[in-house]
Regions:
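Conserved pre-ATP/AMP-binding loop-to-beta segment of ANL
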Residues: 45-48, 163-164, 169-170, 180-205, ...
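Conserved AMP-binding/adenylate-forming core of the ANL superfamily
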Residues: 46, 50-104, 121-126, 174-180, ...
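Conserved AMP-binding A3 loop
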Residues: 60-65, 194, 201-225
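Conserved ATP/PPi-binding loop(s) of AMP-dependent carboxylate-activating enzymes
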Residues: 374, 385-421, 459
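Conserved AMP-binding/adenylation subdomain of ANL enzymes
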Residues: 224-241, 248-291, 306
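Gly/Ser/Thr-rich phosphate-binding loop
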Residues: 263, 290-294, 304-364, 376
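AMP-binding/adenylate-forming catalytic core of the ANL superfamily
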Residues: 120, 127, 137-142, 293, ...
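Structural core segment of the AMP-binding/adenylate-forming
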Residues: 104, 108-180, 289, 499
Length: 554
């Protein structure tokens, strides 16, 4: 058991006991690849790590020993092509099983990796590559993805290798062909290539309300922060299958498909579906006898539209959700059908689970739960004072300078000013608003900023507005969230047209297709409204809140 190497105490009698006494050891040179993956392989060469399947009948089961050997081969290959500590790689791999092998190899080398979604466009890819100094891209063999990468190549400054995990194309290396003749042994570096806990391990690009996506940095200690996520919220079990539904390009993947789960000895289940259907997901749960399960609220809503009673879901002992608030209606209906309540969790790309419905207290449908013990979470009012019970305030994490929480991001890559603005005061503001009841439960009110959460995706208005405004028919636009009963929120565009253009269904379709071509397709506005003028402040800023308020009252 590896967990007891990092937790002085694993079992707790109550939430109060957990909050007060939970601690995690953070070795100076902790590296997830060596200290978790390779150590599990050393303890038990037959211990399962991953069960993977796809829609085409493909199935792969890997032990930690197999991942150790494959990742060593990959690390030796990557080193042979010039990658080293501090190099940067971009990965567009969906849920291919090779992702786990590749990131393990990159961690062993100290190569910073950037997980990315396959829906990125040429513009998205070029921006990410140049902003982070990417030297290698590895993708799935998908016509769209390959086409976007190849189109972006002339605009990327440092790329010297592009590869595929499941195919052959001119100009691309085949991952399997390249690594097969390399040694399956790789010695942990003890020279200037050695990694330390405070070194940058991973970067996520995350959308904000202004500017281009920010580069959120996590260091090598970050996986240890996810012990709380996996052990005490997901409730994973050693040797049992855990399923979180997430593309490898999203932070949710790190929450539920690798770090905390493997530290706890759980087996990751990955269903690499080309297109989500609720019936297929329910069938996978039944077929593989999943023990613990986590998906966004939208997926629970879709599954409830199926005949859930048709499926044997009795293997699942714990259901969880995160990404957006979950209504009491869904929680109650799910309990009626399965006998289990869904435990909510709350957090950000910048951290691990921050607030959750932990096992020591009753679940209250609609609540976020209570704070994780590794964060000093408070609610602050407009005056910067801690809120009383029942008073709304912004969720903040205190003491991030004097007592940095393990798992919290360490800054924005190559941007000292943004890092100082976010963390320099010692208080990290999540820009989310909530209130606390008399029993300590937090209840989500809404986002302070304008980021849209649609079906688990985070969508920044600036990127969509920039794309939309490139169309000649558009003078200016505002992107906001509109309520949706299935997705929670959908993207809405409020548009002021240029002279000579008139509103029509055909123009709406044209604008939607225009956005799909310029940015990731999931960001396109499902609702388009034409107006004579956009609401603005005296200073000329668009008042998106006014649009949202008007939509909520319709």
């Amino acid at each position: 058991m590896l967990l007891d190497r990092y937790l002085p105490r694993i079992e707790f009698d109550s939430y109060e006991d957990f909050k007060k006494n939970y601690t995690v050891k953070t070795p100076e040179d902790f590296n997830f690849a060596y200290d978790i993956v390779d150590e599990w392989a050393k303890e038990d060469k037959e211990k399962k790590a991953l069960v993977w399947c796809d829609d085409n009948g493909g199935e792969v089961t890997l032990t930690f020993e197999e991942i150790r050997k494959l990742s060593n081969k990959a690390a030796n290959y990557f080193r042979s092509i010039g990658l080293k500590k501090g190099s940067v790689a971009l990965l567009i791999l969906r849920q291919r099983w090779e992702y786990w092998v590749i990131v393990t190899a990159l961690m062993k080398l100290g190569v910073i990796f950037i997980p990315a979604t396959l829906q990125l466009t040429k513009k998205d890819i070029a921006y990410r590559a140049n902003a982070a100094g990417v030297e290698m891209i590895i993708c799935i063999d998908d016509d769209y993805v390959v086409g976007q990468v190849e189109a972006a190549l002339p605009e990327m400054d440092k790329i010297n290798k592009i590869g595929l995990v499941n195919g052959n194309r001119d100009g691309w290396f085949n991952f399997h062909d390249e690594i097969k003749d390399f040694s399956d042994e790789f010695n942990r570096p003890d020279d200037d290539q050695k990694t330390y806990g405070k070194d940058i391990m991973q970067i996520y690009f995350t959308s904000g309300t202004t500017g281009m996506p920010k580069m959120v940095c996590h260091n090598y200690l970050h996986p240890l922060g996810h012990i709380v996520t996996a052990k005490y919220w997901h409730m994973v079990q050693d040797g049992k299958l855990h399923m979180t539904n997430s593309d490898s390009g999203w932070a949710k993947f790190g929450w539920g498909k690798i770090y905390g789960q493997w530290i706890c000895g759980a087996v990751i289940f990955a269903y690499d579906a080309e297109k989500f259907t609720a019936s297929n997901m329910l069938a996978m749960i039944e077929k593989y006898k999943i023990t613990t399960f986590c998906v966004p609220p939208t997926i629970y809503r879709f599954m409830l539209q199926e005949d859930v009673k048709k499926y044997d879901l009795s293997s699942v002992e714990h259901w969880t959700t995160a990404g957006e608030p979950l209504s009491a209606e869904v929680v109650n209906k799910w309990e009626e059908l399965t006998g289990h309540k869904i435990a909510s969790g709350f957090g950000q790309t910048e951290g691990t689970v921050l607030v959750a419905e932990f096992p020591w207290f009753e679940k209250r449908p609609g609540s976020l739960g209570k704070p994780s013990p590794i964060y000093n979470i408070q609610l602050l009012n407009a005056d910067g004072m801690e809120c009383e019970s029942g008073e709304e305030g912004e969720i903040v994490i205190k003491d991030v300078d004097t007592n940095p929480p393990v798992g919290l991001f360490v800054g924005y890559y190559k941007d000292e000013e943004q890092t100082k603005n976010a963390l320099g005061s010692g208080i990290y503001n999540l820009k989310d608003v909530a209130w606390r009841d008399n029993d300590g439960y937090l209840w989500f009110v809404g986002r302070h900023d304008d980021v849209i959460k649609c079906s688990g995706y985070r969508i920044g208005p600036f990127e969509v507005e920039s794309a939309l405004n490139e169309h000649p028919a558009v003078v200016e636009s505002a992107i906001t969230a509109a309520p949706d009963p299935i997705r929670g929120q959908v993207v809405k565009a409020t548009v002021k047209l240029a002279e000579g253009y008139t509103p029509s269904p055909e123009l709406i379709k044209e604008l939607q297709n225009h956005v799909k071509k310029l940015t990731a397709p999931y960001k396109y506005p499902r609702i388009v409204e034409f107006v004579d003028e956009l609401p603005k402040t005296v200073g000329g800023k668009i008042k998106r809140a006014s649009i949202r308020h008007e939509d909520s009252n319709k």
